Amino acid sequence: MAAVCDICGKGPGFGKSVSHSHRRTSRRWDPNIQTVHAVTRPGGNKKRLNVCTSCIKAGKITRG
């Protein structure tokens, strides 16, 4: 599953993990993506969307 929000387009962030001895290895931080059933428009069809939790908390979708 792609780690991209269907509403805001938030995707993974990239960076380095740094150990105690300062060795650096690449890593990525994925957003908290949840699959939800949402109504596309009032009285419309339900659709399955991949949405980040910040969009769910902000009320950017109507769950159905």
Curated annotation (Swiss-Prot):
Superkingdom classification of source: Bacteria
Keyword Ribonucleoprotein among record annotations: yes
Cystine connections: none
Gene Ontology cellular component annotations, sorted alphabetically: ribonucleoprotein complex; ribosome
Keywords (A to Z) from UniProt: Ribonucleoprotein, Ribosomal protein
GO molecular function terms noted in the UniProt entry: structural constituent of ribosome
GO biological process terms held by the UniProt record: translation
Entry similarity comment: Belongs to the bacterial ribosomal protein bL28 family.
Protein name: Large ribosomal subunit protein bL28C
Taxonomic lineage: Bacteria, Bacillati, Actinomycetota, Actinomycetes, Mycobacteriales
Gene that this polypeptide is encoded by: rpmB3
